[in-house]
């Protein structure tokens, strides 16, 4: 009679707890011997077992026990100590692996981008060095040409100065010669012309 009474009470408790919607998700702990019971107490029979780390929906709580519904749509009672509000490593590992893969992919992309930028920077640096070397060579060439032009200008100025001096000397000699010849004619003409006059008079 007591067994029937307990069974009726358990059925009523179950039907009452089913109507309560907690809408709460918890996770079975890593305990390997996690058993489900038909009621909220050790006196109730074991209704089965549940895998560690499985997510379950909380329907009701009574004392040390919690009524849950698993992914197989089974409803049973489990010790509060066998539940956790944080996902187990079984649930977290795939997420962590996915995050690690995502981060690895991002790092790989960043590394690829960095390598491309490094190669581009090295190429530009090398190109700039080559252009700088060309400009330096052109600058040196222009300096050499400028020095050669200055030397030629100095030579031309020296030649021009020498030519000017030579022309001046030639003009000086020519002018002196003309002056000398004129002076000579000026001295000789007075002596030549009177003699002619005398000869004309005698005739």
UniProtKB/Swiss-Prot annotation:
<keyword id="KW-1133">Transmembrane helix</keyword>
<dbReference type="InterPro" id="IPR003646">
    <property type="entry name" value="SH3-like_bac-type"/>
</dbReference>
<feature type="transmembrane region" description="Helical">
    <location>
        <begin position="167"/>
        <end position="189"/>
    </location>
</feature>
<protein>
    <recommendedName>
        <fullName>Uncharacterized protein HI_1605</fullName>
    </recommendedName>
</protein>
<feature type="signal peptide">
    <location>
        <begin position="1"/>
        <end position="23"/>
    </location>
</feature>
<keyword id="KW-0472">Membrane</keyword>
<dbReference type="InterPro" id="IPR016476">
    <property type="entry name" value="SH3_dom_pro"/>
</dbReference>
<keyword id="KW-0732">Signal</keyword>
<keyword id="KW-0812">Transmembrane</keyword>
<dbReference type="GO" id="GO:0016020">
    <property type="term" value="C:membrane"/>
</dbReference>
<comment type="similarity">
    <text>To E.coli YgiM.</text>
</comment>
<dbReference type="Pfam" id="PF08239">
    <property type="entry name" value="SH3_3"/>
</dbReference>
<feature type="domain" description="SH3b">
    <location>
        <begin position="24"/>
        <end position="87"/>
    </location>
</feature>
